[in-house]
Amino acid sequence: MGPMCLNRHMGILLKNISTLLTLQGAAAKQGRRIKEEDLSLLQQAAVVIEKNKIVWVGPQKKLPKEFARKKALRDYDMRGRTVLPGFVECHTHLIFAGDRAAEFEMRNQGVSYQEIAAKGGGILSTMKKTRASSLNDLVKAGQRRLDHFVSQGVTTVEIKSGYALNLKDELKMLQAAQKLSGIRTVNTFLGAHALPPEFKSYEDYLTFLADEVLPVVAKKKLARRVDVFIEKGFFPPEASEKYLRRAQELGFEILIHADQMSLSGGSEIAVRLGALSGDHLLQIEDKEIRKLAQSEVTGVLLPTADLYTKTKYPPARAMIDAGVRVALATDFNPGTSPTQNLNLVGLLARLEMKMSLPEVIAAYTVGGAHALNLQNEVGSLEVGKSADILCIDQDWQTLFYSVGEASEKVVFSRGKKVFGTLK
């Protein structure tokens, strides 16, 4: 807490906040072993915003006089609302064309994923539609989806490519993601998502990506992160590790779709290379959990994908108790998690993965911020951080409690109101 210099241009005062969840304690613990006290609750609080940043946060009765002057700040009366950091949605496949609803019905009728893929379905089905889609159409669909995330209180969204699987159209996907507006977005290059029909082996395709695509993505600054789907029968560990090392040489941050279907070494590679995150992690065991706990790798858990694919859930309780920092996300994609519902993610985390509500809130704020290497900017409400703020008209304990929850929300991104109405 404490003031920074307030310059002369108009700032914002959020006052009459009933309960403020700053998450300062969770941020100080880097998102590990979260307890309720780490939400750092303040009653009857206020927040001051200047130049898109938080410059003061604390009990309203302690608001410095220079911030209380009407001429200096625009007042927003929270009227007893609850205020917390905007959610960080750290794993999505937001840019794509078409849907895979017919495949969903086929899976429910007993057709295997492998059979669907053999018939030209799966990721390759989305690939065909995405390659054929115009940049403008991808932007329009992506903006609509992004706005839906914003309406739920999300202020940062990660967006992966990976549904084009060639140079021209992977760049098109990343360009579409860059054109989205309203909140902070983070691009990830996921060319290593599936094997396109133009290639016969995963190793040859990884070589193509490393030699022909990564340098172009780096030069055009279309993404700052590189992801790969390491799995038995898909991208092999050894070739994937070589590919990720090349990405690091080019200046990319790295992350891994790891140990989703089998224990295939993805999480261990993540630790060895210093990846930002290992995502999915359904199959990891005690040895992998211990290594993750001793590292800076964030475990990104995606329970709606597990729900849709009817698989087991990751061992979240064992991970958290061992000291692994975890994040939660939707894995929004047209095939295995066609949902943007944050409440469902959090509810599954509580019901199926035995996470406490404070752990879920921290995972969707501080944990997500670490997964994106944005922990110094977002995830908690502290002086100097971005004014990414969610205001709700309900008690904080109603968060991630009802799938159909419909609280009235107001959302600020970088100090600008981007959703909701305040009088």
From Swiss-Prot:
Report the co-factor binding details.
Answer: Binds 1 zinc or iron ion per subunit.
Give a Gene Ontology cellular component term annotated to this protein.
Answer: cytoplasm
Example of a GO MF term: imidazolonepropionase activity
Which prosthetic group or cofactor does it need? Zn(2+); Fe(3+)
Its recorded reaction(s) are: 4-imidazolone-5-propanoate + H2O = N-formimidoyl-L-glutamate
Give the residues the record marks as binding Zn(2+): H91, H93, H257, D331
Record Pfam families: Amidohydro_1 (PF01979)
Task: Using the UniProt record, name the top-level EC class of this enzyme in a single word.
Answer: hydrolase
User: Which positions in this protein are listed as binding N-formimidoyl-L-glutamate?
Assistant: Y163, N333, G335
**What's its EC?**
3.5.2.7
Write down the InterPro entries for this protein, in alphabetical order: Amidohydro-rel, HutI, Metal-dep_hydrolase_composite, Metal_Hydrolase
Q: Recite the UniProt keywords alphabetically.
A: Cytoplasm, Histidine metabolism, Hydrolase, Iron, Metal-binding, Zinc
Q: Name the domain of life this protein comes from.
A: Bacteria
- Report residues binding Fe(3+): H91, H93, H257, D331
The compartments listed are: Cytoplasm
Q: Does the keyword Repressor apply?
A: no
The reply to whether Zinc figures as a keyword in the UniProt entry is yes
What pathway is this protein a component of? Answer: Amino-acid degradation; L-histidine degradation into L-glutamate; N-formimidoyl-L-glutamate from L-histidine: step 3/3
List residues binding 4-imidazolone-5-propanoate: R100, Y163, H193, Q260, T336
Described by its record, this protein's role is as follows: Catalyzes the hydrolytic cleavage of the carbon-nitrogen bond in imidazolone-5-propanoate to yield N-formimidoyl-L-glutamate. It is the third step in the universal histidine degradation pathway.
Protein family according to the UniProt entry: Belongs to the metallo-dependent hydrolases superfamily. HutI family.
**The protein's name in its UniProt record:** Imidazolonepropionase
Question: Can you name the source organism?
Answer: Bdellovibrio bacteriovorus (strain ATCC 15356 / DSM 50701 / NCIMB 9529 / HD100)
